[in-house]
């Protein structure tokens, strides 16, 4: 009887440990998502501050990003 109880307790501990490990692995990725969301919002605020003569630089930067995304990786 003791062996059955010990086996059940061991399995419960293993399941709880696995779930805790998954949760603690999820927390850093959630923090990264929050940081990128705030950076994106800050980027939009900075773009609103650009003067019209400087907006052309941002367009060129986007064109280069578009060009690089379509280039094959060597």
UniProtKB/Swiss-Prot annotation:
Pro-sequence residue ranges: 44-74
Keyword line: Amidation, Antibiotic, Antimicrobial, Cleavage on pair of basic residues, Membrane, Secreted, Signal, Target cell membrane, Target membrane, Transmembrane
A single GO BP: defense response to bacterium
GO cellular component: extracellular region; membrane; other organism cell membrane
Record PTM Lysine amide, positions in chain: 39
Signal sequence coordinates: 1-22
UniProt subcellular location: Secreted; Target cell membrane
Tissues expressing this chain: Expressed by the venom gland.
Top-rank taxon: Eukaryota
Family: Belongs to the non-disulfide-bridged peptide (NDBP) superfamily. Short antimicrobial peptide (group 4) family.
General function of this protein: Cationic host defense peptide that have antibacterial activity by breaking membranes. Is more effective on Gram-positive than on Gram-negative bacteria.
Protein name: Antimicrobial peptide 36.4
Protein's organism: Lychas mucronatus
Top-level taxonomy: Eukaryota, Metazoa, Ecdysozoa, Arthropoda, Chelicerata
């Amino acid at each position: 009887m003791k062996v059955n109880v010990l086996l059940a307790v061991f399995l419960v501990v293993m399941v709880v440990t696995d779930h805790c490990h998954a949760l603690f692995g999820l927390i850093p990725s959630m923090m990264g998502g929050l940081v990128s969301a705030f950076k994106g919002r800050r980027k939009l605020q900075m773009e609103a501050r650009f003067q019209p003569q400087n907006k052309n630089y941002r367009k060129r930067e986007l064109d280069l990003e578009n060009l690089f995304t379509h280039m094959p990786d060597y």
